[in-house]
From Swiss-Prot:
UniProt keyword terms in alphabetical order: Chloroplast, Membrane, Photosynthesis, Photosystem II, Plastid, Thylakoid, Transmembrane, Transmembrane helix
Family listed: Belongs to the Psb30/Ycf12 family.
Keyword Membrane: yes
Family matches, as HAMAP family: PSII_Psb30_Ycf12 (MF_01329)
GO cellular-component term (any): photosystem II
Gene that specifies this protein: psb30
Subcellular location as annotated: Plastid, Chloroplast thylakoid membrane
Protein name: Photosystem II reaction center protein Psb30
UniProt main location, coarse: plastid
Length: 34
């Protein structure tokens, strides 16, 4: 039996951890190009 709630929490946590640096990188990249 698969526990979808745990998988969902792990996926959302991973997305947050990956999205944080990604957003900062994109913002810095855009400011640098402008």
């Amino acid at each position: 039996m698969v526990n979808w709630q745990v998988i969902g929490q792990l996926l959302s946590a991973t997305l947050i951890v990956l999205a944080g640096p990604a957003v900062i990188f994109v913002l810095a990249f855009k400011k640098g190009n402008l």
